[in-house]
Structure formats: C-alpha cells, structure tokens
C-alpha cells in the first residue's frame, strides 16, 4: 500500500467517523425535541414568570419549543457558587426566547454559554487615555453580552425582572437584545432586519429617538426611556427592547414611531399580554 493509498484510507475513515457523529447528534437532537414539554417546567413558568400565563396558546406552544432547543444547545455555567438548577435554566431560557417568538429566527446560533453569578459581578476594563496610558477599571455589572457566544447574568437581577414584568427593566431581555444586535458583528443598535429598505427606516427612527433622548436628558428632563439608553445606540436598542416588552402601552402612546419599528422587528404586540 502506497502513502497515497494510506492517506485516502485515513481520510475515508475520518469522514465516516465524522458522518457517524453528525448522524448520532442529529438523531439525539430530534429525539430530545420530540419529548413533551415537562409539566414541572410549565408549573415553574406559571409561578415564576407571570407573563407566561398571559401568552396566547400558539405563542406559548412556540415558546416551549424554543426553550427546549435553547436548553439543548446552550451550556449554563455557575460562577461564584451559583447553582445551576432547572429554575435558573428554564426561566432564563424562557425570557430570552420571548425575543424570538413569532418570527424567523436563528435561535441565537452564535450563543454557546450563559454564565450566571448570584449577584452583581465585577467586569474589568482596560482603557487608554489621550496620552496613551492604559489603566484598568472595575465596574459592577448586572449582565453582559459578548459577541463571542457568551452572556453573563446576575441571578438576583434575573429574579427581580421575572416577577416584575411591567417596570421596563429586565436584564435578560436587555442582554439577549444585545445578542440579536451582535448577530451581524459588533453591537451597533441595528440588528439583522428583514429587507434592505428596513434599514433606512430603522436608522431614521432610531437616530431621531436616540438624539431626542440625549437632548432631553441634557436639559434635565425625564423620559419614559431609561437614561442608560442614551449611552450609545447599542444600549439604546437594548433599553427600548425592555420597554417594548414590559411597558408597551406607554411606549406606543409616547413613542409611536419607535414602537412601530420594534413591532415590525419583533413581530409581536406585547400590549395584548398585559394585565387587564
């Protein structure tokens, strides 16, 4: 047997092994997705995430399928002693998957890991001043989204958000909005849209609303949109996503064009889920 024969033999065996692993994973995935949504998870969502009960039946069923896919394809990691229980996994998955309901979605294809801390965590940042001097700063964080497939969350902040789904603040919605924004690269406040024309309309509406928020805050005024949204366009998108899902009636009334743009992107009307 020549070296060429050996090369092709090894290559063939490697391809057979790869195909076997792929077929096994596909079969295992299909089997997992065919399982009924566990009653324990359903009860968990009813008691821990009140908005779940108010979803229409079709959206509730779709959310369950997204949750199962999410939990099968993403890995949770506990940090600083945080236990990764079914409650932690299911609640985070449910809130994250609210953002991908009722529309064609990649299901966070770039996301691999969710790191969960018990409470606020410290993020270290290197910054360079005008003279080129590099220093390190430390910031207490509730959550963070990275473009390399990672989301970091503080569990106590997640809990506050899931029980109070009407204050316009939700760390899971915020960080996973960043994930959607990062699907086309760095977070810039413009996620992947459906048509080429959509980008022009999006840019017009968001630029105007972002500028108005900054101007209002500079004058010392109050805004329905949290002041953190004035940081940059990426944070603006994440902040108004929280508002869209949690305070849709107020947003529709005070920021109708912004609400319309977000409704066109998320293809939902969360006002239908609000308490009567």
Regions picked out by a protein language model, each given a short descriptive name:
Residues 1-119, 185-201, 205, 248, ...:
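N-terminal low-structure segments adjacent to metalloprotease catalytic domains
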Residues 49, 53, 78, 82, ...:
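Short, charged/polar micro-motifs that form catalytic or ligand-binding hotspots
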Residues 56, 167-183, 238:
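Active-site recognition of the HExxH zinc-binding catalytic motif
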Residues 91-108, 113, 117-166, 186-276:
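Metalloprotease/metallohydrolase-associated module, dominated by Zn2+-dependent proteases
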């Amino acid at each position: 047997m020549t070296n060429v024969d050996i090369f092709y033999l090894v290559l063939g065996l490697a391809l057979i092994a790869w195909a076997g692993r792929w077929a096994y994973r596909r079969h295992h995935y299909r089997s997992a997705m065919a399982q009924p949504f566990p009653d324990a998870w359903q009860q968990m969502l009813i008691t821990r995430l009140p908005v779940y009960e108010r979803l229409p039946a079709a959206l509730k069923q779709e959310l369950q399928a997204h949750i199962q896919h999410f939990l099968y394809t993403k890995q949770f990691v506990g940090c600083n002693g945080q236990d990764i229980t079914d409650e932690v996994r299911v609640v985070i998955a449910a809130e994250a998957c609210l953002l991908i309901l009722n529309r064609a979605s990649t299901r966070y294809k770039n996301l691999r890991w969710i790191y969960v801390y018990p409470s606020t965590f410290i993020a270290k940042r290197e910054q360079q001043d005008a003279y080129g001097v590099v220093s390190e700063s430390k910031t207490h964080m509730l959550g963070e989204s990275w473009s390399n497939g990672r989301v970091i969350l503080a569990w106590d902040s997640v809990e506050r958000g899931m029980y109070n789904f009407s204050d316009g603040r939700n760390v899971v919605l915020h960080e996973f909005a960043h994930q959607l924004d990062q699907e086309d690269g760095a977070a810039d406040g413009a996620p992947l849209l459906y048509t080429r024309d959509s980008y022009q309309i999006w840019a017009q509406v968001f630029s105007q609303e972002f500028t108005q928020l900054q101007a209002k805050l500079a004058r010392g005024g109050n805004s329905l949109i949290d002041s953190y949204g004035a940081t940059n366009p990426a944070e603006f998108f994440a902040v108004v996503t929280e508002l869209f899902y949690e305070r849709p009636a107020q947003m529709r009334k005070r920021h109708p064009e912004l609400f319309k743009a977000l409704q066109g992107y998320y293809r939902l009307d969360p006002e239908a889920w609000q308490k009567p």
